[in-house]
Amino acid sequence: MKINKKLFIQPILLFAFMSCSSNNQFIEIDYSKNANLVTMEQQFYKSSGSGKLIAKGKNNFVSYFDFISTHNSSSIIFRDFLRRKQFLVEIVDENIRYHDMKNRKDIDIQSFNNFFPIATRMDANTYKKLMWGIPDIFNEINLTTKKEFSVSTKLISVDDRNLINELIFSFNDNVQEYKLLFLDRKFLDKE
């Protein structure tokens, strides 16, 4: 039985070409579906979850975190690579407290800023929006901050709502980068 080489080789080449082509699928985002903090707090009692902070550049580390946020209080616990508690950020109403859990003492924002340099740019509402996954978190970023770093986001659609899944802060023309990646986020319904 004689096999036509062209018929045999063409499907293989077509398969190889299709396998090597990039699969860059761009999806148009419907911003009207972005989560809204007021609406989320009306529907849910709390947001909780976990994630990791990844630093690349001059400082390289991975810190896992757990968070919980309700209407008037929130907290984030950062852990080192061995999952030991490292820092606590506690928010009650508009007050933010930073606590070094290894040394068992409160610290000021500048000390925490050495770990996470965006801290001085975040107020209580920004932390809260971050934990609830609200995409407009940095819409009102001021001009001086824009010169210091850039922010990029990746959204995920959950229950027909766009939520923040990843935030990347790039400093000094991408020499230093801090990525906040949310591994899971749960919402507890109001009863």
Which residues make up each language-model segment?
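Sec-dependent bacterial lipoprotein signal peptides
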Residues: 1-20
